[in-house]
C-alpha cells in the first residue's frame, strides 16, 4: 500500500500517494485521483495539531498535505473549493520545531516554493488564479480565496 498524505481544513481533505502507479490511479470509492495520489475531503473541525494527528491515524504514513508543483496546487484548490466554497484549511507546511526552517509534516522536500513571503503570511498563487494564504504562526490556517 502507498503512503498517505492529508490536507486538513479546519475541515479536512485527505490525500494519499499510491507509489509505483502511473496514470491509472485506482482510488477507493468517494476519493478523487490525480498524479498517483488520491484525495478526499473530510468535514471535521479541529486545530492543526489535531488535524495532523487525525491524518496519521488514518493510514500508515499519512500526514497533512504537501504540495510539490502548481498543477497539484490547482487540483487541491479545486477540490477544496468544490467542497467548502469558502473556508479554512490546514496543510502540512510548518515551522513548529525548526525555528525558521519550513518543512512538510510528511518529511517531503520543500521543492515547491511558489509563494511570496510577507510580514505575516505566505501567499501561494495557483495557475487558476486562486490564492492560498498562510499565517506564520504555527497554528494559523491556510485560507482560500479568489483574487478580487
From Swiss-Prot:
Family matches, as InterPro entries: C-type_lectin-like, C-type_lectin-like/link_sf, C-type_lectin/snaclec_domain, CTDL_fold
First and last residue of the signal peptide: 1-23
Post-translational modification: Contains disulfide bonds.
Keyword annotations of the record: Disulfide bond, Hemostasis impairing toxin, Secreted, Signal, Toxin
Keyword Transmembrane: no
Disulfide bond is among the record's keywords: yes
Tissue: Expressed by the venom gland.
Domain C-type lectin positions: 34-148
GO CC terms, sorted: extracellular region
Pfam families: Lectin_C (PF00059)
The organism's place on the tree of life at top rank: Eukaryota
MF terms in GO: toxin activity
Subcellular location field: Secreted
Function field: Interferes with one step of hemostasis (modulation of platelet aggregation, or coagulation cascade, for example).
Comment field (misc): Shows greater sequence similarity to the beta than alpha subunits compared to other heterodimer snaclecs.
Family, per entry: Belongs to the snaclec family.
Subunit structure: Heterodimer; disulfide-linked.
UniProt name for this protein: Snaclec 4
Organism expressing this protein natively: Echis pyramidum leakeyi
Amino acid at each position: 500500500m502507498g503512503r498517505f498524505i492529508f490536507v486538513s481544513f479546519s475541515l479536512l481533505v485527505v490525500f494519499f500517494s499510491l507509489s509505483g502507479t502511473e496514470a491509472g490511479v485506482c482510488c477507493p470509492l468517494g476519493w478523487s485521483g490525480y498524479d498517483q495520489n488520491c484525495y478526499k475531503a473530510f468535514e471535521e473541525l479541529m486545530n492543526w495539531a489535531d488535524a495532523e494527528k487525525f491524518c496519521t491515524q488514518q493510514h500508515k504514513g499519512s500526514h497533512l498535505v504537501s504540495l510539490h508543483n502548481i498543477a497539484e496546487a490547482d487540483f487541491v484548490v479545486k477540490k477544496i473549493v468544490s467542497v467548502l466554497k469558502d473556508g479554512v484549511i490546514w496543510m502540512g507546511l510548518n515551522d513548529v520545531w525548526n525555528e525558521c526552517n519550513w518543512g512538510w509534516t510528511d518529511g517531503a522536500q520543500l521543492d515547491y516554493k511558489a509563494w511570496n513571503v510577507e510580514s505575516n503570511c505566505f501567499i501561494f498563487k495557483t495557475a487558476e488564479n486562486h490564492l492560498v494564504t498562510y499565517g506564520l504562526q504555527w497554528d494559523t490556517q491556510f485560507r482560500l480565496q479568489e483574487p478580487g
